[in-house]
Amino acid sequence: SLDPLLRQYAMLSAMVVEGTGTAESASAGALERLSVTGTQQSELILTKKKSIQFSVSGCKGKEIYLRLYGASVPDQTTEFSVSGNGKTRSYRYAPKGDLMYSEQRDPCIQLGVAGNDELEIELTLLRGREISFDSLEVCSYDISDYEASVAALQQAPHLADVSYDENGLRGSISSQTGGWVFLSLPYD
């Protein structure tokens, strides 16, 4: 299956604006790695008494994704939270043999669009004894590039009568040829 971060990025890149006889991809902007300070890659172990805290710089105006690589396989159900940018997300691993067990060891956790240049991120163990990770990285893309792509799409003739609000999408989408229509519905 496609990596969650790449899936999101691919969906944004798949948005199409019809041009004169061609189709152009609406750019989502370049995916960028941000600078992480305050933790060593060898110290990525969560226990009940030890959280992982670090700072990320260069965040303002960017959608932030935390990538954790190589999560250890726990011997019991283990859950941890990720807090940063005013959001808290939780992630759970089940032990092998459990119905909820997954081979996915590299979660990608979205933390929204940052209003500040510097973010403090904290991982805390909620359930279980311990979980460790091989490494982490923080990726982002500039939200202004995404907004410019959305604005271009909203001006496209085939979307002229489409409107949306916080709870829905209304209107009709017309196309000169048959094919796929991709909709990305944001949620928080």
Task: Describe each region flagged by the PLM.
Residues 1-188:
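Active-site-proximal, structured, solvent-exposed surfaces of multi-pass membrane proteins
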